[in-house]
């Protein structure tokens, strides 16, 4: 399979050598590179390539006969590679990504933030107002922290049920552990609870500084939970999740 999305970038920008995301190089006074600064969605071309035909056909064969869901986040390396043309796969989206052309269809949505977040004005060129979109009738569930009466498709996320199923035997002292540090774990818990047999993840890298510390360990915990339950996991070739050197075999151990 070919590498993940070759992200088209505007003049003056580059690709991160680690994750492939579009970045701007910040230079010192002497002109030498100092560090990378990630670009925002609107700074990158809205025209991203879909998955190639060969890879698409291979993945369709691997999904055959399996209840499959694709999570789609906003990382530009693979967000457009999701199986939008395979109606046998549920597509679960998040936040304001409905504004972008690569988000061609969806079956369920997740907006797991407090009301001031999703009602705010997005001062981003080309992005449709998020809250008015949420207030439209889509006829599909939008999972939220609580039902919002202004949002006709809003559904309260079944957190108590997820906690009872997945965390009843995990404690820190006398405290029952609850471990969801981003939207992806909520999606994963629901998919596992509903018996999905295959989970594909697109546009979720958790490679940024804020994500890497708090969100990535939790995301990888849930990937491990899924694998332990016998669920198939598919990540695009260059995805940064559950990726590292082989301790002892590659590099010196401790």
Language-model features: locations:
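Metal-ion/cofactor- or nucleotide/acyl-coenzyme-handling active-site neighborhoods
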Residues: 48-254
């Amino acid at each position: 399979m070919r590498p993940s999305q070759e992200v088209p970038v505007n003049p003056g920008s580059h690709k991160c050598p680690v994750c492939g995301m579009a970045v701007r190089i910040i230079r010192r006074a002497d002109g030498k590179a100092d560090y990378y600064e990630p670009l925002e969605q609107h700074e990158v071309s809205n025209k991203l390539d879909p998955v190639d035909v060969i890879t698409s056909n291979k993945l369709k064969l691997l999904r055959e006969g399996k209840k499959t869901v694709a999570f789609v986040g906003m990382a530009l390396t693979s967000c457009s590679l999701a199986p939008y043309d395979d109606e046998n796969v549920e597509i679960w989206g998040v936040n304001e990504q409905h504004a972008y052309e690569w988000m061609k269809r969806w079956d369920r949505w997740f907006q797991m933030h407090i009301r001031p977040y999703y009602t705010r004005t997005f001062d981003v060129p080309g992005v449709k107002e998020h809250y008015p979109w949420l207030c439209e009738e889509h006829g599909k569930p939008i999972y939220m922290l609580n039902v919002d009466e202004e949002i006709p498709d809003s559904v309260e996320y079944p957190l108590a049920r997820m906690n009872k199923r997945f965390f009843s035997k995990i404690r820190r002292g006398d405290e029952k552990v609850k471990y969801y540090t981003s939207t992806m774990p909520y999606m994963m818990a629901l998919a596992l609870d509903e018996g999905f047999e295959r989970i594909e993840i697109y546009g979720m890298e958790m490679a940024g500084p804020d994500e890497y510390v708090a969100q990535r360990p939790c995301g990888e915990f849930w990937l491990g939970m899924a694998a332990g339950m016998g669920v198939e996991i598919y990540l695009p070739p260059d995805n940064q999740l559950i990726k590292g050197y082989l301790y002892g075999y590659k590099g010196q151990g401790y």
